[in-house]
Amino acid sequence: CRNMNWTGALYEPIIAGNNTQTLRIYGSLTFIASMTNSFQGKVYFESIEQGNMITCAGKSFNNDVVFQGSGGWSLGDDFTCTRGLIFQSGSFQTMGKNISCSNFISTSGLNRYLDIENSTINLVYLYNNVYYCPWEVNGDNLTLKSQKSNLIYANHNYETFRHYNEAKEYNNIFYNGSPYSGSINGGGCSFNIIQVGVDTVGSLSYNP
């Protein structure tokens, strides 16, 4: 579809589908509070235009959400998906809203503009997810704006942060759960704060 806007819909609508189906949106998306999102498949945002807005109204995505195409997307409110947020190309701006996902993946090497300023990204890893590393980013052809942003880990094992190729500036990383043998492979990136919570059990290695 071009734009999906549920504003004004009556009778508590439900969007449904199994995990073999996909939903492709070529513009903006607006959910409403009275609806239910039971769609289990992947969702693809594939606009070639700027100015697209995503408004979730408290609804979660139940599978990977993929942003690809040369367009631009901004968040109108907080964004939650139980699996991966995959940013392949285009422009993605959080507008100070918060994100919760299992993985944030941006490895394509295509032109990307990523603005997470003033936002918190909660990485709540789903252990049977196909993606190994909760945060994995290829710095080539990427513009990153991260001032006053936070990456918060809750329940991760092994490699938790991987950035490679062109180095970027990140802000804060917090571990509030148990990283166990967690590791940060920084790829030459700079950080403001890397902090492990007082109740966190395990070890964390840092490879700059």
Model feature map: region roles:
Residues C1-P208:
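Extracellular beta-sheet-rich ligand-binding/adhesion modules
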